[in-house]
Structures are given as structure tokens and as C-alpha cells.
């Protein structure tokens, strides 16, 4: 992937959603909602404060995160659908 996010942006790949419910019902792709979880593939250097100091991001590559359904901008890179969003749009990091 030749994509490097700027400032406080991150690049996220959505995680695959279960295609079957707990009771065994198979959900077709057309009816399935896009998952609101993903894995961070790249992070920007951070955001500068008013004094010009660079504040690094709290998230890192490999983190599994939760974000809003409409957060970020979807882009296609090398056939993969990725999301570019600001760190502020990330709601939580999923602890392993």
C-alpha cells in the first residue's frame, strides 16, 4: 500500500462481518450492514497544537477500533476498500 496519511488521519480496513447469525441464519451480502469495526493500517504523524508542538496520535498500526457508520472517506487502493478518517472520528480501541 502506497498511502501515507497526513496530520491526525488514519487509514483503516473494515473487518469482515459475520455472514451468519447466532441462530444459523445466513445474511446475504446485499442485506448486511457495513461493519463499524476495523484495523488501523497506517497513522499520520499527529496534529500540531497552537504552539506548533506535534502531538502524536493515541492509536497505532494494528489497533482494532470502533467508529461511526458514516465516519471518514472511503477510498479504493489496490482493489481494497479502505477508510481515511481523523483520529477524532474513532470512538474506541477494542482491547484484546
UniProtKB/Swiss-Prot annotation:
Main location: cytoplasm
PANTHER family the UniProt entry points to: 10 KDA HEAT SHOCK PROTEIN (PTHR10772), CO-CHAPERONIN GROES (PTHR10772:SF58)
Quaternary organization: Heptamer of 7 subunits arranged in a ring. Interacts with the chaperonin GroEL.
Single Gene Ontology BP annotation: chaperone cofactor-dependent protein refolding
Function (record text): Together with the chaperonin GroEL, plays an essential role in assisting protein folding. The GroEL-GroES system forms a nano-cage that allows encapsulation of the non-native substrate proteins and provides a physical environment optimized to promote and accelerate protein folding. GroES binds to the apical surface of the GroEL ring, thereby capping the opening of the GroEL channel.
NCBIfam families per record: PRK00364.1-2, PRK00364.1-5, PRK00364.2-2, PRK00364.2-4
Keywords: Chaperone, Cytoplasm
GO molecular function per UniProt: ATP binding; metal ion binding; protein folding chaperone; protein-folding chaperone binding; unfolded protein binding
Family per record: Belongs to the GroES chaperonin family.
Species for this entry: Polynucleobacter asymbioticus (strain DSM 18221 / CIP 109841 / QLW-P1DMWA-1) (Polynucleobacter necessarius subsp. asymbioticus)
PROSITE patterns attached to this UniProt entry: CHAPERONINS_CPN10
UniProt-annotated location(s): Cytoplasm
A GO cellular component annotation in the UniProt record: cytoplasm
The protein's name: Co-chaperonin GroES
Record SUPFAM superfamilies: GroES-like
Gene3D superfamilies xref list: GroES chaperonin (2.30.33.40)
